[in-house]
Structure formats: C-alpha cells, structure tokens
Amino acid sequence: MDQRLGYKFLVPDPKAGVFYRPLHFQYVSYSNFILHRLHEILTVKRPLLSFKNNTERIMIEISNVKVTPPDYSPIIASIKGKSYDALATFTVNIFKEVMTKEGISITKISSYEGKDSHLIKIPLLIGYGNKNPLDTAKYLVPNVIGGVFINKQSVEKVGINLVEKITTWPKFRVVKPNSFTFSFSSVSPPNVLPTRYRHYKISLDISQLEALNISSTKTFITVNIVLLSQYLSRVSLEFIRRSLSYDMPPEVVYLVNAIIDSAKRITESITDFNIDTYINDLVEAEHIKQKSQLTINEFKYEMLHNFLPHMNYTPDQLKGFYMISLLRKFLYCIYHTSRYPDRDSMVCHRILTYGKYFETLAHDELENYIGNIRNDIMNNHKNRGTYAVNIHVLTTPGLNHAFSSLLSGKFKKSDGSYRTHPHYSWMQNISIPRSVGFYPDQVKISKMFSVRKYHPSQYLYFCSSDVPERGPQVGLVSQLSVLSSITNILTSEYLDLEKKICEYIRSYYKDDISYFETGFPITIENALVASLNPNMICDFVTDFRRRKRMGFFGNLEVGITLVRDHMNEIRINIGAGRLVRPFLVVDNGELMMDVCPELESRLDDMTFSDIQKEFPHVIEMVDIEQFTFSNVCESVQKFRMMSKDERKQYDLCDFPAEFRDGYVASSLVGINHNSGPRAILGCAQAKQAISCLSSDIRNKIDNGIHLMYPERPIVISKALETSKIAANCFGQHVTIALMSYKGINQEDGIIIKKQFIQRGGLDIVTAKKHQVEIPLENFNNKERDRSNAYSKLESNGLVRLNAFLESGDAIARNISSRTLEDDFARDNQISFDVSEKYTDMYKSRVERVQVELTDKVKVRVLTMKERRPILGDKFTTRTSQKGTVAYIADETELPYDENGITPDVIINSTSIFSRKTISMLIEVILTAAYSAKPYNNKGENRPVCFPSSNETSIDTYMQFAKQCYEHSNPKLSDEELSDKIFCEKILYDPETDKPYASKVFFGPIYYLRLRHLTQDKATVRCRGKKTKLIRQANEGRKRGGGIKFGEMERDCLIAHGAANTITEVLKDSEEDYQDVYVCENCGDIAAQIKGINTCLRCSKLNLSPLLTKIDTTHVSKVFLTQMNARGVKVKLDFERRPPSFYKPLDKVDLKPSFLV
C-alpha cells in the first residue's frame, strides 16, 4: 500500500488546486509574486529627505498598483513573434510635509499616473494548458505543460532553481589551527519592507580568549559576545556559564569556564565596571570612527534596534538568549565539527524559485528607482533651489531591463539562472525547472566549497542518478526526486501561521517555556520565542507534529526539528524555499498506515489531499532539516522485520525506491539492475532524445527537432505516466537482435534495416529559424545580373513559400550598391550581392515567412525538413546502450526467423556483458510478453509497470511473462515456453537459408533517437568558401567553413613526418609525453633514486641491468604501475633483431635486363 500512497501524490489533485504535480510549486511561486507580493513591494510610503530635525520631510508614495494580463494567448504571441508579458502600472506622488503648530501641512511637488503601456512589462509564466495566474480562463492545451516564459521574438525560456547564498545555520570555519569563525546572517521577515540584511561574524582565537568578539562591517560594534549577551539578556556571567555548560562534553565545559573567566578579567580590569557604560563607550567610539551625520542617540538606536533584523520586534532579553544559544553551537562545533551541518549541506540553504527571482529583482530595482528620485531632487535643489523631479526619472523604474537580463540568464550579475528552452526534448520542460544549482561564481570565489560530491543531505530529496557526468556543472546541479517540492507561502499566511504557533507555545505553563538557563530554545525561522523544559521536549514535538497533520495550524508543510546531540534546540521553519516531501508516519513504534484498515479499501476513490484530511496521521510533509535530524526507516519491508523495541526508535518511514528518482531517471528502466554509471549516462541520453511535436510547431519560428511517428512506451513507471512524458512519447518500438553481423557492428556500431527507415522508422522533422536584417535601401535595390542564389526569391525579394532551399540559396534580397567616382565610365553604378545564404547540407522546405518593416527589413523564415536515419546518427535504449549507425542493410541481407521477420536493428551482443545492462533484457522480455497479452483480465489495455528503481526480483518479472504466454497459448511445451519467455529464437542465414547454430536474443524494445545528427556536425570538406584576405577556409559551419590545414600544419608533416605527427596528436598533449627507462633483463620500469635510474629487481640480485630509454604516454606508465601493485606482472619486452648496419649489403647486378 505504500507504493499506492506514493502514486497518489504524483497524480493531479484538483481539490487542492494541483493540476500538474511536477511543476506545481513553480506555478504557485510565480502566482504568489504577481498576484500578491508585487503589490506589497510597489506599495510604498516613506520619507526621501528630511530637514530641520525632521520637521520638514520630502515624502514619496506609490499606490494604485495594477497588473493587467495580455489580451492574447501564448500561441498568438508566438505567431506575432512577440513576448508574452503582463503590464504593471502605478501612481507616484512626491510631496513635502512640514510640521507646524497647527499640524502637518502638505505641499505637492510632483506626481505621475503611470498608464504607459511599457512602464513595467513582467514576463508572464505560462502554466499547464497555456494558462497564466492572471487569466485562468485561457483554453487548455493538454500536451502543453508550460513552465516557460516567451521572450521577445517568441524565444521560450526556462529556468533552474538557485541555492541561496545566505544560510539558515551559521557557517563554521577553521581559519588556522586554534582559530575559528562562526558567521551568520540575519534577514528581516517578509512583512518588513524594504528587506534588511545584516551579516555577523563571531571570532575565537584560543590564545586570546578575551577577543571572543562579534562584529559586523559598519553596522555593529566589535564587542565581546559574552558581555553583549549579558548586556542584552540582563543576566549574570554565572548564569551564562551554567547555560553554556549544560549538557556539554567535558572538553567543551573546560573551554566555557576559560571563556567566562576571560570575560571576568575584562570586567575586573575596568574600575567600577558597568555593562551599560561599557557598551555606550563602544558605540560612541564607533560613531566617531564612522563619522556619522546622525546624533549619538540616533546612531545608538539605529545600531541596537536593527541588531538581528529577523528578531526586529523581539525584546532585547530574547536577543541575548539567542546569542547564548549561538555561542553554544559554536563551542560545541570546535570539538565536534562533523556533527554540525556544514555550509554545503542543503539543511542550511533555501532555494530560489521563479517567484523569488522576480521578487528579489523587483525589490532591488524599486530601491534603485527611489534612490534615483532622491538624487534628482537633491541635484535640482542644489542647482536651482527647487524641489523638483524630472519626468524621465519618474517614468523609468528600471524593472524591464532587470527582467530582460534575468531571462537572458543573468540573475543579479550571476549566470546560470535561465536558459533557452531546447525544442527537441519534451522532457526538458520538466527537468530544467525541477533542477537545483549553486551559483557558479559562488563556487569559483569560495575555496572551501566541496559541493562537487554527492552530499549526504541530498539523499531522498534529490535524484542520485540525474547529475551532470562531466563539465563545470558536475556536482553543482541536482534534480529533485519525484516526491520533492519547494515550499511557498504568502506574507499574510506567514503572519497568521507565526501567530498561531506562538499562541500554541504560550498555551504551555509559563515556567515550562521560560527555561532560559538549561532549556531547549524554541525558534521560529531562527527567531527565539521561548525555552522549553528539557523534560517536555519529546511530548512537545510529538504533540506539535500531530496538530500540524490535523491542520491545527492551517499549513501542512511546517517543519519542526528536534536538534539533540548537545546543541539542544527546537527549530520551527515556516518560510518559503524549503525542500519538502511526504513520509509515512511512525508513532510509538507503529506504522500508522497499518493502523487504518479502511484506508486500503477507500484509496482508489481518494486524492492525496483527501488522505491528508481523512487520515491525517498516515502521511506527513517533512522538510529536509526535519528529515536530517529524525530517525527514518528506508522501507516498509525493513520496518516490519524489526522488533517492537527497534521500531520505537523511528519517527518516519520512506516510500519505495522508485520515488527517490527524478522524472528523467523515471523514464529509464530498472537502473538498480545495471551498473552505476549506466544510470547517470542514461539520464543524460534520455534528455537528448527527440520527442514528439509540440502543439503549435508551425506557429513558432524557432529551432526544433521533432519525432514524426512517436509511440507511447509499453514498459513505463507511474512517474512517467503521471508527468505525461509517456503520453507525449520520446521514441518508437523496434525489433532488435543481439548478435554480430559480419564484423560491422563492433563497439557502438549498429545495423539498421533499410525498409524500416523507408517506412518512417524513427523519422524526424527539423524546424529551423533563419533570421536576417537588411538595410531598407539594399532590400529595394534590383539585381543587375541574374544570380543563381536568387532563384528561389519572388519579385518582392522574399523567399517563396514551399520552396526547397539548397546550400547557397539566398533567404532575402540584399544588394549593396556604390557609385564610382570615374568620369570616363559609362555606368559608374556598381552593385554586388551581400545576402546571407542557406548553409545547411540538406534541402529544406520553406514553411513560413515573416517580415517587419522599420528602419531595417527584418526577415524571419521557418524551414522544415524530414530527416531519415543515415550513417553516423546516434540512437540509444533507455538503459544507456548508445549506438551509432554503422551500416544500413537491405532486408534481403538480414537474418530472419521462422515467420520471416527480420530485425529492425542489430546490436552488438557483447555490449550487454561489458556495460552490465541486465534491465535492457528485462525490458525486451516484458515488451514481448505485453504483445502476447496486451489486455488485463477486465479487457482493458494496460502498460507494464517496470519502475526505474525497484525492489522486485527478476524472477517475478519472468513469472509475469510466463503467465502472459500461458494465457495466450496454454499448449506450449516447456522448451517453447522458455524460448518465448527469454526471447530466444532460431534465425536463418539470408545467404544459405540455414539456421544459425545458436539461438539469438530477438524481441521488441523502446528505442530513442538522439539529437546528435551527422549532417548537423559535419565540418570537414576539401573544397568550399575561403576568406578574401588570406584565402584560407572560413571558420564555423554556419559560414560554410571547414578545418583549415595551413602552413604550420604542412611544415609539421614535412619536417616531422606524417607518422610521427599522428603519434604526437594521439598522445594528446605535451604533458602526456614521458620518457621511461626499462630494464632489458626483467622488463621492469626503472626507479629513480637520488637522481640515478636503477632497476630494483636486478639490483637486489646483484645483476648489472641494461637500461633502455623509451618514450610513452604517462597513462601507460600509470597503468603498468597499478597492475604491478595488484600483483599482475606486465613485462616490457624488446624485439631482438640485428642492427641494419651490421647486415651484409645485398648484391646489385648492373647487367642490362635484355642480357639476363
């Protein structure tokens, strides 16, 4: 039943507003921004400038924020070649407030009622079925899942989710031996605008314990943290000593005593020490140092009031206790670093989703906009003596440029956020918006980053298979598992939830939540609200979790984490950007799923939200922090095998293994039956597979590759079905044979049947965009001499519809003319063709032509081409058995079975053994079994469920295949049944018509065509275009270029010899080249001892070895050394033959041939 419960989460849940689960969190994130958060950010009323002790102020007020959706649908935007944007308008009022005896008088300075259609254009996210959050009445297009933005010129953009730089746990760092830092950030809650950020650092040097200071650049004083905690919390140093020492190991207690004693020495060194005076003196010194324009009282209030912005409305006493709890973690982390979440752990990070990107940019650009207005007022007052604002400043908020840069892939000057949507794989629509990555520049700058390994905190929440296998993104980008999502919350919901949780905590007896000396601090989003009696922590957490599941707080995604291990804290998280996923609940040693017997009978008629309402204690939404500090059993089967006492140790139980994969990995089959690298390679190849046509391919003038005759896979997983990847298809079923064919299909080479290609097998259509900009005078010029390049153009200068373009054909007329200053020439007007040519190697048909007339003529042409498989094209199975077409064979050349059926594809049989892809054989067996019995016992067509990762034994699948064949043909003998189950057939030689000696594995499989096409990559050519200046080959395929073989390359062949040049190229680089001395007696590589080359084996036997110098590659030497270390002797031997100069010369007969 655990598997069925997991499936319920994947399917749509209309009662909860979930229509497409994979991207639902992105839709909610963006919807929250454009419907709510944008109004909160833009609605502003604050002072710009103040004069005369705040009696005169220049105020700005922004109001009447309206967001209007576009009148047209995304398809119309594609046809017009325009972006799909919402329009945001607002009203700006700037006025002067003067405080008088009668009251406040207001004088208007300037105002602007923004009705400009280009004031703020917000790219609109297209959701499932072409819907958008502003206009939910748009019609539904079932195979369009959305998740994209349409940029200008109808370019679709998708984005990944970046990990926030700010961590929710302080960052511990060892600066040098016995010197440590503890850095943390404090960010104001979402209801406080503009958002305030403060970054603090606690430093500790064991040799200078008095300098245990907390500091922040220009925003806080540098002060001993123990004394600061005493100042804020108003407690004694002995209180702080007891609080820091409680439940700590002896080594930490020793350090705590030393720190408190050092703080006492500071107080004793000052006569009549007073903590208030001490802090005030430090504030005054900082005031003088910064040369602040504020008064000392204003400066002190600004510094201390804004200390810890996330606890802005919290009493100073709680801030002091919060600092004590931070110091506890710091001191414990010095001795037990491995038990503390490091900075690479996902426990410490929140994730930026689509809505958060736009929210951050809107906030930053609004501050820039207000800053520009303030500066303009100051400049006008300085120059002209009037308070005025230029209209240009009011009408340029700057948000359009920021949003445009975001969709160009730059978020706050960092690359990696958004990219162009690739139109060859439908699967990329899901995989890219569900990927999570680190800032690339963050990794380059920070030397201590180690995210390139699979971090333990990513377990269960991220797919371990779908990660980049090579390149700069290795370890930096991860794919969410199918059950994972990212939380979103509105500001109003945040405040209500915080209020309800605080009321619940304060419902406890006052003394039980005031254990500030030895209790467990309770924090809500890192803000300290109480300190709980240690004897009540288990009951508190258990009751809180039960109330959360029952909907007591109105939010089922609240995270509550009980941090033990001497750090002693209860952390409650309610903010956005947290990773959450469902788990099965274990309560008091019982799996709650088993306690509800009626659940299984009602499960088919329930949605996931129904289960959460009617059976609240079965499933709990758990964030990654709560999961990390909880005891989780990896499977229901393992849990049920435990004793009762062991079961009581667990809090949660996980779903089956298939739910730990991402959606791309779910498109594979049985990856746990294969070797590990096959899963990573399989995910990369599945994303390169060409999928079916999108709904409006002819309306988009954009590049794309699409499968013409797609088929729905027979062997699928539930995630593949619910995500609609299966329904939208990404391959075809072909009949394969695993055998050798005349030695042609070696390595990755495959044989493909010619008639299979002619019938449209794995046929694709390529859509390509050609765009040119032509000066208007060039476009209107007429050609004087007839050019073959213009043979496909009409009289209007544009290419004809349905014309077939070949290499060298012009797309539009572009004739440049020039007048010669020659009085003797009859015709001093010359013209020449400068048009851009069609450069592809294959012919294409013109599908659509668009023209825009401005100062230039912008021509956009869409060409279509059907492309059948040719030599060199790449294909793959869903188990990463990649193959390249080595030979296209006629049907008469291929072996056939007793029914005359020939294989569509022949694959090298040794690839199964070398790559260990057992699940490929299982897929063939299950697909063949489906063909024998495609309907279930109710007469309904049913695909075969073979999840990507599963705990089902292979014998179970064999038994399923056996039942299918027995049902369709019960009279089969045991041998015939075994052959059908294992897809073994006798094939006949097409030349002799005699059967082969052994049976061949022969059956159907789902085959994918990859986007790596030969004709798109071929660049080498003997003849072609040359540059005018140096008459060498052009660079780049688009310009008809090739690989240049110039003078330096020629000189290498002449001076060095062709054979040596090839050897040098194959050695890869100069660093790979290595001289090695080899002993001619034993064949060992000589060792270098004190600069002398010696054979260790012969020297021990007192032999005099003869060492010969050879040149080889470094990798060869490493291979020999490693083989020798494993006990395998590899001897380097020399060919024994006499030198050529010792051989007697051959006799030469000089007699004429006719005399012989």
Curated annotation (Swiss-Prot):
<dbReference type="Pfam" id="PF04565">
    <property type="entry name" value="RNA_pol_Rpb2_3"/>
</dbReference>
<dbReference type="GO" id="GO:0003899">
    <property type="term" value="F:DNA-directed RNA polymerase activity"/>
</dbReference>
<dbReference type="InterPro" id="IPR024390">
    <property type="entry name" value="RNA_pol_132_poxvirus"/>
</dbReference>
<protein>
    <recommendedName>
        <fullName>DNA-directed RNA polymerase 133 kDa polypeptide</fullName>
        <ecNumber>2.7.7.6</ecNumber>
    </recommendedName>
</protein>
<dbReference type="InterPro" id="IPR015712">
    <property type="entry name" value="DNA-dir_RNA_pol_su2"/>
</dbReference>
<dbReference type="GO" id="GO:0044423">
    <property type="term" value="C:virion component"/>
</dbReference>
<dbReference type="InterPro" id="IPR014724">
    <property type="entry name" value="RNA_pol_RPB2_OB-fold"/>
</dbReference>
<dbReference type="GO" id="GO:0046872">
    <property type="term" value="F:metal ion binding"/>
</dbReference>
<comment type="similarity">
    <text>Belongs to the RNA polymerase beta chain family.</text>
</comment>
<comment type="subunit">
    <text>The DNA-dependent RNA polymerase used for intermediate and late genes expression consists of eight subunits 147 kDa, 133 kDa, 35 kDa, 30 kDa, 22 kDa, 19 kDa, 18 kDa and 7 kDa totalling more than 500 kDa in mass. The same holoenzyme, with the addition of the transcription-specificity factor RAP94, is used for early gene expression.</text>
</comment>
<keyword id="KW-0479">Metal-binding</keyword>
<comment type="function">
    <text>Part of the DNA-dependent RNA polymerase which catalyzes the transcription of viral DNA into RNA using the four ribonucleoside triphosphates as substrates. Responsible for the transcription of early, intermediate and late genes. DNA-dependent RNA polymerase associates with the early transcription factor (ETF), itself composed of D6 and A7, thereby allowing the early genes transcription. Late transcription, and probably also intermediate transcription, require newly synthesized RNA polymerase.</text>
</comment>
<dbReference type="Pfam" id="PF00562">
    <property type="entry name" value="RNA_pol_Rpb2_6"/>
</dbReference>
<dbReference type="InterPro" id="IPR037033">
    <property type="entry name" value="DNA-dir_RNAP_su2_hyb_sf"/>
</dbReference>
<dbReference type="InterPro" id="IPR007647">
    <property type="entry name" value="RNA_pol_Rpb2_5"/>
</dbReference>
<dbReference type="GO" id="GO:0006351">
    <property type="term" value="P:DNA-templated transcription"/>
</dbReference>
<keyword id="KW-0548">Nucleotidyltransferase</keyword>
<keyword id="KW-0946">Virion</keyword>
<dbReference type="GO" id="GO:0032549">
    <property type="term" value="F:ribonucleoside binding"/>
</dbReference>
<dbReference type="Pfam" id="PF04567">
    <property type="entry name" value="RNA_pol_Rpb2_5"/>
</dbReference>
<dbReference type="GO" id="GO:0003677">
    <property type="term" value="F:DNA binding"/>
</dbReference>
<dbReference type="GO" id="GO:0000428">
    <property type="term" value="C:DNA-directed RNA polymerase complex"/>
</dbReference>
<dbReference type="InterPro" id="IPR007121">
    <property type="entry name" value="RNA_pol_bsu_CS"/>
</dbReference>
<keyword id="KW-0808">Transferase</keyword>
<keyword id="KW-0240">DNA-directed RNA polymerase</keyword>
<dbReference type="InterPro" id="IPR007641">
    <property type="entry name" value="RNA_pol_Rpb2_7"/>
</dbReference>
<dbReference type="InterPro" id="IPR007645">
    <property type="entry name" value="RNA_pol_Rpb2_3"/>
</dbReference>
<dbReference type="InterPro" id="IPR007120">
    <property type="entry name" value="DNA-dir_RNAP_su2_dom"/>
</dbReference>
<keyword id="KW-0804">Transcription</keyword>
<dbReference type="Pfam" id="PF12415">
    <property type="entry name" value="rpo132"/>
</dbReference>
<dbReference type="Pfam" id="PF04560">
    <property type="entry name" value="RNA_pol_Rpb2_7"/>
</dbReference>
